[in-house]
């Protein structure tokens, strides 16, 4: 299981979820992607993306003015 990171701070929505989609093509089953983003709708966007993509949102939490989450593939 590999853990990859994506720093999407400064990107406006929906760019963080588009970056997640691009990264998802490189992920294998069981891999984890940790994402840090600060756009206003990121939490709901990542929840929706995981539901549509059938990926597991392991957790999401605030980190300063941003949100950090882990998605399992």
Annotated model-derived regions:
Residues 1-73:
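Domain-level signature for proteins that mediate thiol-based redox and metal-cofactor handling
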